[in-house]
């Protein structure tokens, strides 16, 4: 761990974004940990309000909102908070807790990329998959500076809300809050051309964790599991480079955020075959009981039961995913929360599985 800190500090001058105190907030915690089944809401930009019917579900304890930065702040300094206001008010009145999953990266507003170095890649998964978009370099100080300004506005408006329990760390990201970057062979060549190194990527994340620790002292800060690019410090392709980069980023989050750190895997399914199943599941389960841990299903079981582990049987797919994400580790600890997409939570036929899942968190 010490070796990683030394390497990271050596590249911090690349991120001249002002100085922040290094906050290891282990002495004070938010009143309650995130806990239970959580519904994932995907913002629909074409609609003026969120559809919050799902908050009435008795098996759901929390709400995770996925929303793009450019849909909140299309004009610099003029954020539209209406949907976030709506969600927090409804969550408070229905006794639910909230996680913000705000996506910069590909989904940053155009003004935030002016003057920033970008590379064009196809979106690698999710809505818009395959669409060519500009991605700001994860360590670009212009881009990160704008993102940090937005986070400050976010914290000033919602940082004291009792309903807001988790904020997802993002910034050196691409398509979601997971720390994943495009990594096909031809994309690796682009990263080499723009000077990607593990140290630059780790240093960007270290700065991000410091900002979140300072701006959100009343919340847990989640990190959705990803990995580094398989490029080493010499900017050469190295199939072993990604794993230590991932470990270093998790280590920095643990060091800076302390007990307010929540490690999350957002690729959970019910596939038993380790060649198809989610590789991050055992890693996160290993942290159960030491820090807050959680899982998010990779997709809806109703819409894609085959990929979720039971072709043609959404109920079984959801049950298998729940069992996988809530299995105790060797010390007997389970994860704190499990996130399920709105389509599955609204479906009548899935209610027995939701009841079953909720019972595991009591």
Where are the language model's segments positioned?
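Sequence-pattern detector for short linear motifs
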Residues: 6-8, 301
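Boundary at the C-terminal end of the N-terminal hydrophobic targeting segment
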Residues: 24-26
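Aromatic-lined carbohydrate-binding surfaces of glycoside hydrolases
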Residues: 31-196, 212, 217-241, 246, ...
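N-terminal secretory signal peptides that target proteins for export/translocation
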Residues: 1-4
